[in-house]
Amino acid sequence: MAEEKKEVQKTPEQKMDELNRQLRGYMANIEALRAEISVINQSITDLRTAEATLRSLKELGKGKEVLIPVGATAQIKAKSEGVDEVIMSIGTGISAVMSYDEAVDRIRKEIAALEALRRALEEAIADLYNKIEELLEEVRKVGQEEAKK
């Protein structure tokens, strides 16, 4: 004999509680994604600064006097030796000597990868906002049903 499963009807309050939990979860996810985007934006800014600094030093040429920040508000004078070679971090505390062009190319590729990741996270946020809109519509329906009673 087949047993019939009886669907337990949720009260409007239970439905609203469940919808509110889902809404809070989506909002928490959005905030987490925004925090990740903020970190990515800072990394992109740092990489662009590095690229601009390398370009400026290359244009400056060898033998020019530059000021190097050493912390707080202190700077020291130094002479530019050019940027024919750049020491770049390649991960986990390891650095490698690269030509200027290789270093700039690597920086640009990192920026492009981070921008692609940022776009993906922004799309995920947009999807979450769409889900929130759907949930809000359900909240309105439940509220209207409750008001009719």
UniProtKB/Swiss-Prot annotation:
HAMAP family: PfdA (MF_00308). One of its GO terms (biological process) is protein folding. Pfam families: Prefoldin (PF02996). It comes from the Bacteria. Belongs to the prefoldin subunit alpha family. Keywords: Chaperone, Cytoplasm. The keyword Kinase does not apply. Molecular chaperone capable of stabilizing a range of proteins. It is found in: Cytoplasm. CDD domains: Prefoldin_alpha_GimC (cd23160). GO terms for molecular function: unfolded protein binding. One of its GO terms (cellular component) is prefoldin complex. InterPro entries: PFD_alpha_archaea (IPR011599), Prefoldin (IPR009053), Prefoldin_subunit_alpha (IPR004127). This is Putative prefoldin subunit alpha.
